[in-house]
Amino acid sequence: MDKLRLVVGLGNLGKQYAETRHNAGFKVIDRLLSLYHVQLEERNNLGEFILLRKHKVVLAKPNTYMNHSGKFVKWACQNWNIKPDKVMVVYDELAFPLGTVRLKMQGSANNHNGIKSVIAHLNTEHFNRLRFGIKSDNTSNILHEVVMSEFTPAERNLLETALTKAIEALKGYIDGVTMLKLMEVFNA
């Protein structure tokens, strides 16, 4: 299939993590699946996925813990012959306040273990990212406590706003809008 893309959301497995900030990538993928009226239909030991042939995209969530996400991303790229520059990784970003969505074409992991794993397994920093802000004024300064905390009822409106922005950006990406154009619109 010509120019297939991969959109993968990062998160942790298990009901105990489902509503945590660290699972923002999974939340975005779930919302994207809902937009296209599909579910992740296939699974292996590394992840769950669906190939949307009409849109030339694979939507996916790893079945690994965050720190091992790169194993699935590497497998998916090899399985569908997807180049790293056609990969979009969606993940939580503690450096940005909740409600913020930023796109990036390459760069370091900035202490995000899921991104560190993707970089290590793809052997490159040259892949696209959608960074979903999760920082809250009410959260601890201890990294683990912050990312494993749940969104509060007071944060629900900001969460919904950010999910809407993320879906708009990913829909553009899937529809073939260039990353530079998407960054111009969504990073403004």
From Swiss-Prot:
Residues at the catalytic site: H22
Keywords: Cytoplasm, Hydrolase, RNA-binding, tRNA-binding
Main subcellular location of this protein, as a coarse class: cytoplasm
Residues carrying the site annotation Discriminates between blocked and unblocked aminoacyl-tRNA: N12
RNA-binding in keyword set: yes
Transmembrane segments: none
Secretion signal, residue range per the UniProt entry: none
Protein name from the UniProt record: Peptidyl-tRNA hydrolase
Species, as recorded: Mycoplasma pneumoniae (strain ATCC 29342 / M129 / Subtype 1)
Higher taxonomy: Bacteria, Bacillati, Mycoplasmatota, Mycoplasmoidales, Mycoplasmoidaceae
Designated gene of the protein: pth
